[in-house]
Swiss-Prot record:
The keyword Acyltransferase applies. Keywords: Acyltransferase, Cytoplasm, Fatty acid metabolism, Lipid degradation, Lipid metabolism, Transferase. It comes from Aliivibrio salmonicida (strain LFI1238) (Vibrio salmonicida (strain LFI1238)). This is 3-ketoacyl-CoA thiolase. It catalyses: an acyl-CoA + acetyl-CoA = a 3-oxoacyl-CoA + CoA. InterPro entries: FadA, Thiolase, Thiolase-like, Thiolase-like_sf_Thiolase, Thiolase_acyl_enz_int_AS, Thiolase_AS, Thiolase_C, Thiolase_CS. Pfam families: Thiolase_C, Thiolase_N. Pathway: Lipid metabolism; fatty acid beta-oxidation. It comes from the Bacteria. Catalyzes the final step of fatty acid oxidation in which acetyl-CoA is released and the CoA ester of a fatty acid two carbons shorter is formed.
Length: 387
């Protein structure tokens, strides 16, 4: 089988979903901006050679409906010969898009693909139109459809305290703010027009969601958001609602060498896994272990990790059971995570992979893992290797 490589990876700035910079920008525009941007940044790639676009999106309705992948590619003015499909594995949608496209390249069904994902949670809320079948209650706890309560359950099972959660959330904002100030996001963010608080058109260059003013005292004062009587999970220790998109240009190693392109990373292995929906946030643990086994690697072989921070109460048990608690500061989410940057559902998989690859380049890391939990009890993971 062919080796699959990433030659470029970018994202939009992350905008707040409530009255944020992208409140007048549609999801198709966020997506099209990155599709065009990838081709503009890589003039050696003939767009007519691109086989397919795989685009993650969870709420596929309203402006995100009717195959947003195809709508965005047409909006971007890409050749009409490029096919496009929209992928949904809930929170792992754009990482699943990466996996699907990679498999197509591995078996020779494509040479070049664009992958990515988008979610405009300000325009299409995550619970829009959700209608669970009542029969699910025979096999799954009702609370399994309430992500915050699953985080509460997982945190309690693993003895994660409110103080630990607040400290984790505080660190996420501090790391993300420091990364912004020091320019560590500059190589992955493709600036995009949005609107400031006065409604004026502005070029958005940085993430809007990060709250550098966050303090431990402020976090401690927040009330539990999901279990008012006995809970520990607050809005401050949960991933922020945000709007954004991310994208990658991937191809076979042979094609990259033929075109004289710099290979930024190679796919070593991929995995998905299921777990009890009541503790959906635990999914990264079995998925990561499975991906590492397929790559012939151990957890100690990995230099850097990007773990999507759905909730602090969810992230910390995963870090503990992967044996990474003692190296958390050195190896995990060096630039913060979704608690600070937000979690635009369909965007996040390729967003964390993009951030991981940029951090691997910056630090000289050889091996990295991007992994995330998925609503209703799944996990997904990808092992990357730099040349």
């Amino acid at each position: 089988m062919k080796n699959v490589v990433i030659v470029d990876c970018i994202r939009t700035p992350m905008g707040r979903s409530k009255n944020g910079v992208f409140r007048h920008t549609r999801a198709e525009d966020l997506s099209a901006h990155l599709m065009k941007g990838l081709l503009e940044r890589n003039p050696n790639v003939d767009p007519n050679q691109i086989e397919d676009i795989y685009w993650g999106c969870v709420q596929q309705t309203l402006e995100q409906g009717f195959n947003i992948a195809r709508n965005a590619s047409l909006l971007a003015g890409l050749p009409k010969s490029i096919a496009a499909t929209t992928v949904n594995r809930l929170c792992g949608s754009s990482m699943q898009a990466l996996h699907d496209a990679s498999r197509a390249i591995m078996v020779g069904d494509a040479d070049i693909c664009i992958i990515g994902g988008v979610e405009h949670m300000g325009h299409v809320p995550m619970n829009h139109g959700v209608d669970f079948h009542s029969g699910l209650s025979k096999n799954v706890a009702k609370a399994s459809g309430m992500m915050g309560l699953t985080a509460e359950m997982l945190g309690k099972m693993h003895g994660i305290s409110r103080e630990q959660q607040d400290a984790f959330a505080f660190a996420s904002h501090q790391k993300a703010h420091r990364a912004t100030i020091e320019g560590h996001f500059d190589s992955e963010i493709l600036p995009m027009e949005g609107h400031d608080e006065n409604g004026a058109l502005t070029l958005v260059k940085h993430d809007e969601v990060i709250r550098p003013e966050t303090t431990l005292e402020g976090l401690a004062a927040l009330r539990p958001a999901f279990d008012p009587a006995n809970g520990t999970v607050t809005a401050g220790s949960s991933s922020a609602l945000s709007d954004g998109a991310s994208a990658m240009l991937i191809m076979s190693e042979e094609k990259a060498n033929e075109l004289g392109l710099t290979i930024r990373a190679k796919i070593r292995s991929m995995a998905v896994s299921g777990c009890d929906p009541a503790i959906m946030g635990y999914g990264p643990v079995p998925a990561t272990k499975k991906a590492l086994k397929r790559a012939g690697l151990s957890i100690d072989d990995i230099d850097l990790f990007e773990l999507n921070e759905a909730f602090a109460a969810q992230s910390l048990p995963c870090i503990k059971d992967l044996g990474l608690f003692d190296v958390m500061e050195e190896k995990i989410n060096l630039n913060g995570g979704a608690i600070a940057l937000g979690h635009p559902l369909g965007c996040s998989g390729s967003r964390i992979a993009t951030t991981l690859i940029n951090n691997m380049e910056r630090t000289g890391a050889k091996l990295g893992v991007a992994t995330m939990c998925i609503g209703l009890g799944q996990g997904i993971a990808t092992v990357f290797e730099r040349p």
